[in-house]
C-alpha cells in the first residue's frame, strides 16, 4: 500500500503519543510512500484523499461514525478502525492488536466488507443530502410533548402513532439506539432497514424490518412539539411544520477491513452482552 491516511480523535490523544506510535508501526510493516495525517474535521480538497490505499481511523465508534458521514460520498478507501476509545463495537481491532492488524494487511490476510449507509433529505428544506452509518432518528425535543408520526414505505402509509419518535436503522445501527429501543439485532452484511418506534403510545406499534431498497418517509405532525432529525447522533436539524424526512439506501458503502478471527457473534458476546 503506497499511500496511507491516518485520522485520529485528538481528544483521546492530546500529546500525539498514539499517533506517533502508529506512524512508526505503519512505516515498519507497510513501508508506504506517503503517510497523510488527516484532521477528523478536515475541510480541505477531498481530491487530495482519493489516492489513499488505506485509511486508518484511531478513535472509538463515534469517530468512525463521523468518518463515514463525512467522507463516504467522496472516497471509497478501505478503513482500518483501531479502538482507542471506550466500547469500540464498530472497529476492526484494539490498539493493543495494532501489530497483528498491520501484519495481516501486509501479507494480505484480510477482507474488505461493505456496510450499508442511509441517505437522508428533508423535504421543504434546502440542505445537503446526509449519510448515516447507524441511524436516522426523528424525535421530539427533550422538553417537548409527545408528537404524532406518520410513516410511509414507498409512499404507502405504513403506520400512524403517537410517541417520542422513530428510528430508521441500518444493520450496523441495530446494536445502537435501535437496540435500546427494543429493535432487533441484524447481521451487519445484510441490506435491510429496521423501523423502530420510540416509546410509542399505541400498543400495536412494533419494529418493522424492510428490504433496503424501499424508501421510507417520516411525517411528524408538529403542533406544540419541537421535532428534530438526528443523523448518527452527531448532527441534528429542527423540523418545521410540513417538513418530511425522506430516507433511502445510499448508493455508497462504508468499506471496512475485517479479519477472520473477529466474528460478529464473538464481538456481540464480548462487547454487547459482556460475555467473554
UniProtKB/Swiss-Prot annotation:
Signal sequence residues: none
Entry keyword set: ATP-binding, Cytoplasm, Kinase, NAD, NADP, Nucleotide-binding, Transferase
Catalytic residues in the record: 61
Gene Ontology CC terms, in alphabetical order: cytoplasm
Cofactor: a divalent metal cation
Disulfide bonds: none
Gene Ontology molecular functions: ATP binding; metal ion binding; NAD binding; NAD+ kinase activity
Stored SUPFAM superfamilies: NAD kinase/diacylglycerol kinase-like (SSF111331)
Entry superkingdom: Bacteria
Catalytic activity: NAD(+) + ATP = ADP + NADP(+) + H(+)
Lipoprotein is among the record's keywords: no
Compartment annotation: Cytoplasm
InterPro entries for this protein: ATP-NAD_kinase_N, ATP-NAD_kinase_PpnK-typ_C, NAD/diacylglycerol_kinase_sf, NADK
Positions contributing to NAD(+) binding: 61-62, 134-135, 145, 162, 164, 172, 175-180, 234
Primary site of residence: cytoplasm
Keyword Ion transport in record: no
Any Pfam family hit: NAD_kinase
GO biological process: NAD metabolic process; NADP biosynthetic process
Listed EC numbers: 2.7.1.23
Protein family per UniProt: Belongs to the NAD kinase family.
Known role: Involved in the regulation of the intracellular balance of NAD and NADP, and is a key enzyme in the biosynthesis of NADP. Catalyzes specifically the phosphorylation on 2'-hydroxyl of the adenosine moiety of NAD to yield NADP.
Name this polypeptide is given: NAD kinase
Amino acid at each position: 500500500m503506497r499511500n496511507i491516511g491516518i485520522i485520529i480523535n485528538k481528544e483521546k490523544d492530546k500529546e500525539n503519543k498514539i499517533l506517533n506510535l502508529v506512524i512508526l508501526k505503519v512505516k515498519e510493516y507497510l513501508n508506504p510512500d506517503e503517510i497523510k495525517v488527516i484532521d477528523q474535521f478536515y475541510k480541505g480538497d477531498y481530491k487530495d484523499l482519493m489516492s489513499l490505499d488505506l485509511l486508518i481511523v484511531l478513535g472509538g465508534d463515534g469517530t468512525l461514525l463521523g468518518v463515514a458521514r463525512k467522507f463516504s460520498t467522496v472516497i471509497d478507501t478501505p478503513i482500518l478502525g483501531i479502538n482507542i476509545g471506550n466500547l469500540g463495537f464498530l472497529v476492526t481491532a484494539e490498539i493493543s492488536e495494532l501489530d497483528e492488524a498491520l501484519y495481516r494487511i501486509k501479507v494480505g490476510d484480510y477482507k474488505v466488507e461493505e456496510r450499508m449507509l442511509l441517505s437522508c433529505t428533508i423535504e421543504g428544506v434546502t440542505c445537503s443530502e446526509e449519510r448515516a452509518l447507524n441511524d436516522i432518528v426523528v424525535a421530539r425535543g427533550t422538553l417537548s410533548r409527545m408528537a404524532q408520526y406518520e410513516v410511509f414505505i414507498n409512499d404507502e402509509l405504513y403506520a400512524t402513532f403517537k410517541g417520542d419518535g422513530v428510528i430508521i436503522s441500518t444493520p450496523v445501527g441495530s446494536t445502537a439506539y435501535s437496540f435500546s429501543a427494543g429493535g432487533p439485532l441484524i447481521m451487519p452484511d445484510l441490506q435491510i432497514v429496521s423501523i423502530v418506534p420510540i416509546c410509542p403510545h399505541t400498543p400495536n406499534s412494533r419494529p418493522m424490518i424492510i428490504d433496503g431498497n424501499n424508501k421510507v418517509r417520516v411525517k411528524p405532525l408538529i403542533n406544540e412539539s419541537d421535532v428534530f432529525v438526528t443523523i448518527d447522533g452527531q448532527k441534528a436539524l429542527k423540523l418545521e411544520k410540513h417538513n418530511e424526512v425522506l430516507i433511502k439506501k445510499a448508493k455508497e458503502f462504508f468499506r471496512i477491513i475485517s479479519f477472520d478471527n473477529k466474528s460478529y457473534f464473538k464481538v456481540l458476546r464480548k462487547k454487547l452482552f459482556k460475555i467473554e
